[in-house]
Design a protein with these regions (language model features):
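Beta-strand-rich binding-surface signature
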Residues: 185, 238, 477
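Bacterial N-terminal signal peptides that target proteins for export
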Residues: 3-14
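Beta-rich accessory regions
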Residues: 248-250, 278-290, 294-301, 306-539
C-alpha cells in the first residue's frame, strides 16, 4: 500500500481516524540512535514499505519494495511511492539496483499520468502468454491518482532491471471512480490445472478473484468475504493465494489465502491473517470462519510469499514489512532512512493440535553471518540477574540468542524474561509465560525516543504482545534475533512467532535473563554477535 493510499485507508475506517492520522502525522521525531540494522533490508535513504513478491531469474533473486524518495519527516504521508529493485543470490546479502518503476510518469501514448506506483506483483511469463517475449517479467501494480485506484501493467525484457509501460493502461480501471472504492494490491499466479492466470485483488472488506489468459484482459469470477470482515479485520490488503503441502504430504496439498488485516477484535495491530481452504479454479472456500495469524507480533505486515524452487509445494519463503499502520506515521525514524523488512523465512504447513498451521523460521543462510557463540548451560535462574552467569562480552547491537528453558519439579518461577537493549533505565523484555503457555514482547519502556509519540499511536505501540504456544509443556525453546531496532522471537521451531520494532537508547546493549519469581532452569543459552555485513551495497 502506497503512502497516498494510507490516507484513504485511514479515511475508509472512519472519519475520526482520518483526523487522528492528520494530527499524528504532522511530524515524525528522529530516533536517538543512528545505527542502521545490520542484517535486515533497509532503504539506502528515505522511506520504504511493502515488499513485492520476489522471483528467481538470471541466477539471482529479484525483490522490489515500495519506496518514497520524497519522504519528509515533517509530512510523512506525502510524496507517493515507486518500486525499488534489489537482487541477491542467497536472500541474505542484497545489492541495490535502483528505482525501476517511477511514480507520476506519463503513460504512452496518451501521456496521462495515472498516479504513483503502489503494491502489485511480478511474474516471469515463461510461455509468452502476454506477447512481450518468452520469460518477460510482467508486473501488474496499483496506480492511484486523485484517490482513484486502478491496475496498470509494465513489462521487462531485461530480467526485471527496467520496465516499459503497457500502452493499454490501465488494464483494470476502477469500477466506480466517483465513489473511489478500495481496488488494489493485485497478486497474480499461474493456475496449472486451469491453464490461466489468477489475480486476487483487495476490495475493501473482501477479496475479488479474476482470471486471464494473457495478463492484459481480466474477468471477474468470485469473491471471498470473511465473516464480519469490516468489523473484525478492517480494510483488507495485500492478498496472497497459494498451495502448500500439509506435513510435507503431497496428497494433502492445501490452499492458503493470506492477507493484511487489522486485528481489532483480536487485540492486535495490523498483521497477516490467513485461512486454509480449497480453490476450485474460480473461488476460494475457507475451512474455518475465523483466521489464524502468521505472526503474533505488532510489526509483520504486507507479507509476500513465494515458491521454494527446490521444494515447490513442501515449503515457501516469506518476508514482510516491519511496521504497523497504527503508528507508522508517528515512529521516531532515523535521520537518513525509514523502514525495514523482516528476515526472510521458510514457511511450512504443519498439523498442530489437529489444525493446519503455518510455522516459520529464518532461512538457513542467516546462520553464516553470526560469529562463534558464547554459551552457558544448566543454570538455575532467579530474579537475580547474576544467577544466570551469562558470558561476558555481550555488548553488540545485533545478535542472536538461542535458549532452552524448563520449569522442572521444584521450580517456582512462572516466567523467563530476557531483558535486552538495557541501559539501566530503559529496556525491552521478551520472554515466555509457562502458566499461560505463551511468549511475550514488552516494549513500553524500550527507549526515550518513543515517549514523544501521540497518545493513540503510543498506546498501540506500548501494548504488550503475546504469542500462544500451541503445544505448551514444561520446556520451551526460544530463538531470538535482535538487530539494532528490531526483535523477532521464534518459539519451538516457529510454532509461534513475535516480530516487533524497538527503539533503544544509544549504546543500550545490556542483556539479563531472570525469572519473575522463584527459580527456573536455563538448560542452555548461547549468544552470537553479528557485525554489519554491508549486505546492501551499490551495484
Amino acid at each position: 500500500m502506497g503512502f497516498l493510499t494510507l490516507v484513504l485507508h485511514k479515511l475508509s475506517i472512519c472519519p475520526f481516524s482520518f483526523l487522528l492520522f492528520i494530527l499524528y502525522a504532522s511530524a515524525v521525531p528522529l530516533a536517538t540512535t543512528n545505527t542502521r540494522p545490520s542484517y535486515h533490508i533497509t532503504p539506502e535513504k528515505k522511506w520504504m514499505n511493502d515488499p513485492q513478491r520476489p522471483f528467481f531469474l538470471g541466477d539471482e533473486w529479484h525483490l522490489y519494495y515500495l519506496y518514497n524518495s520524497n519522504f519528509d519527516s515533517s509530512n510523512p504521508g506525502s510524496g507517493g511511492t515507486e518500486w525499488y529493485h534489489i537482487t541477491s543470490t542467497d536472500m541474505v546479502h542484497w545489492t541495490r539496483r535502483g528505482v525501476v518503476l517511477e511514480k507520476y510518469k506519463p503513460n504512452p501514448p496518451s501521456g496521462i499520468i495515472l498516479g504513483d506506483i503502489e503494491t502489485g506483483s511480478a511474474v516471469v511469463d515463461i510461455n509468452n502468454t502476454a506477447g512481450f517475449g518468452r520469460s518477460a517479467v510482467v508486473a501488474i501494480v496499483t496506480q492511484m491518482a486523485d484517490g482513484v485506484q486502478q491496475q496498470s501493467l509494465f513489462y521487462s525484457t531485461d530480467n526485471g532491471y527496467s520496465f516499459i509501460p503497457y500502452e493499454g493502461n490501465p488494464i483494470m480501471p476502477n469500477p466506480s471512480p466517483s465513489a473511489k472504492p478500495a481496488f488494489r494490491d493485485p497478486k497474480i499466479f499461474w493456475d496449472d490445472k486451469e491453464g490461466r492466470w489468477v489475480m486476487s485483488l483487495a476490495e475493501g472488506d473482501k477479496i475479488g478473484f479474476y482470471t486471464s489468459i494473457d495478463l492484459k484482459t481480466w474477468a471477474y469470477v468470485s469473491e471471498f468475504k470473511p465473516e464480519n470482515a469490516g468489523v473484525d479485520l478492517g480494510i483488507l490488503e495485500c492478498p496472497d493465494l497459494y498451495q502448500i503441502d500439509l506435513d510435507g504430504d503431497s496428497t494433502k496439498r492445501t490452499w492458503i489465502l493470506a492477507l493484511g488485516a487489522n486485528g481489532y477484535r483480536y487485540n492486535r495491530t495490523t498483521g497477516t491473517a490467513y485461512w486454509t481452504g480449497k480453490w476450485d479454479g474460480n473461488g476460494f472456500t475457507a475451512t474455518e470462519s475465523f483466521p489464524q495469524w502468521m505472526d503474533d507480533g505488532p510489526d509483520f505486515y504486507a507479507t509476500v510469499s513465494w515458491e521454494n524452487p527446490d521444494d515447490r509445494y513442501g515449503s515457501r519463503y516469506a518476508i514482510a514489512w516491519m511496521n504497523s499502520w497504527d503508528y507508522a506515521a508517528s515512529l521516531p525514524y532515523y535521520a537518513d532512512f525509514a523502514g525495514q523488512d523482516s528476515l526472510v523465512r521458510e514457511v511450512k504447513l504443519k498439523t498442530i493440535n489437529s489444525s493446519p498451521t503455518l510455522v516459520s523460521i529464518p532461512i538457513g543462510g542467516y546462520g553464516e553471518i553470526f560469529a562463534s557463540p558464547k554459551s552457558v548451560s544448566d543454570k538455575t535462574i532467579t530474579t537475580d540477574p547474576a544467577s544466570a552467569s551469562l558470558p561476558s562480552g555481550m555488548e553488540q547491537g545485533a545478535y542472536i540468542i538461542r535458549a532452552t528453558i524448563s520449569k522442572n519439579d521444584g521450580d517456582k518461577g512462572n516466567e523467563v524474561r530476557f531483558v535486552i537493549k538495557s541501559d539501566g533505565t530503559f529496556s525491552t523484555t521478551v520472554g515466555y509465560d509457562f502458566v499461560h503457555s505463551q511468549a511475550f514482547l514488552v516494549r513500553d519502556s524500550d527507549g526515550s525516543a518513543t515517549d514523544s509519540m501521540a497518545a493513540g499511536p503510543k498506546q498501540a505501540y506500548d501494548t504488550v504482545r503475546t504469542a500462544p504456544d500451541p503445544t505448551g509443556g514444561s520446556t520451551v525453546k526460544l530463538v531470538i534475533y535482535v538487530d539494532w531496532n528490531s526483535v523477532e522471537i521464534f518459539v519451538n521451531d516457529g510454532e509461534a512467532v513475535l516480530s516487533g520494532l524497538i527503539y533503544p537508547n544509544q549504546e543500550a546493549n545490556g542483556i539479563q535473563v531472570v525469572s519473575d519469581i522463584g527459580s527456573l532452569t536455563l538448560v542452555s543459552f548461547s549468544y552470537a554477535a553479528c557485525d554489519s555485513i554491508d549486505y546492501l551495497g551499490k551495484a
